[in-house]
Structures are given as structure tokens and as C-alpha cells.
Amino acid sequence: MAILNILEFPDSRLRTLAKPVAMVDDGIRQLVDDMFETMYEAPGIGLAATQVNVHKRVVVMDLSEDRSAPMVFINPEIEKLTDEMDQYQEGCLSVPGFYENVDRPQKVRVKALDRDGKPYELVAEGLLAICIQHECDHLNGKLFVDYLSNLKRDRIKKKLEKQHKLNA
């Protein structure tokens, strides 16, 4: 396993549209393992392949405190099940140090393939629904900051650009 480099906003590669996985093979399973290791090390609760500069439709998540509930979503498709919205303060490994309120549908259904390429379906509410939507947004080149006002997004962008220059 390996720790992968996480791209940070405003890196343009985060805007790349991820391509579907044609076949779940050992290479995809290795990517999944590396993504989990990277996510846990960061630490975070979700990671999309786009964030590690692999533009395939792969997401890993684990909402548990003790790394006991790893979830894999390959080629996920989301269906909104309600018009009711929840507001959560979201953060992102690609937007480090920033947390903002985002409104998202309260309940969704996701269809995906698991680590072995087997199809499954899951109805999600609460934090799980929020995380699934957040991570799947990455696969479509979208970040949680895109839900914010231009003013807030530009402020975050400038602060991160300044931080990147200091770290260079």
C-alpha cells in the first residue's frame, strides 16, 4: 500500500471529470487500498480518486471512529429520494482547514460496485448521505466550495494559494 498525494484547491486537476471503471481488477483494488491508507493517514472520512489525481469513478469512505466500516463505491450513481435538504458543515481533504455550511438532499439512493466488482444499492440519510454526495461531486469535478458565494470561495482560494507559496 502507498500514501498518495492529495491535490488541493485550486488545482485544476480537481475539475477533471472521472471516467467509469471498465473492469474491477487488481489495479483497481490496489487503488482502493492506497486510497484507504491515504484517507486514514490524512485523516479523513472520505476520498475520491480524483483527489489523488486518478480520474476514475472510485470513492472510499469510513464514517467510523475506529476504521471499522470501510465502504467502497465504484462507478457510483446517486438518486435523490427527497426534496428535503440538510445543512452540514463540510470540510475536505482538498480544501484543508476550511469548513462551510452546505445544503444537500437529506436522503439518497446510491448504486455502485464494491471492491470485488459486485453491484449493490444503498439508501443513505444523514452524514452518510452528505458524504456520498460530497465524494461523488469530486468525480464530476465539483468541490464543496462551489456551493458557496463567490466571495467566500475566492477568500478560501486566496488563503490556500498563499499557503501553497509559503510551503513551496
From Swiss-Prot:
Pfam families: Pep_deformylase. SUPFAM superfamilies: Peptide deformylase. It is an enzyme of class 3 (hydrolase). Its EC number is 3.5.1.88. Fe cation binds at residues 92, 134, 138. Binds 1 Fe(2+) ion. Keywords: Hydrolase, Iron, Metal-binding, Protein biosynthesis. One of its GO terms (molecular function) is peptide deformylase activity. It comes from the Bacteria. InterPro entries: Peptide_deformylase (IPR023635), Peptide_deformylase_sf (IPR036821). It catalyses: N-terminal N-formyl-L-methionyl-[peptide] + H2O = N-terminal L-methionyl-[peptide] + formate. Belongs to the polypeptide deformylase family. NCBIfam families: pept_deformyl (TIGR00079), PRK00150.1-3 (NF001159). This is Peptide deformylase 1. The gene is def1.
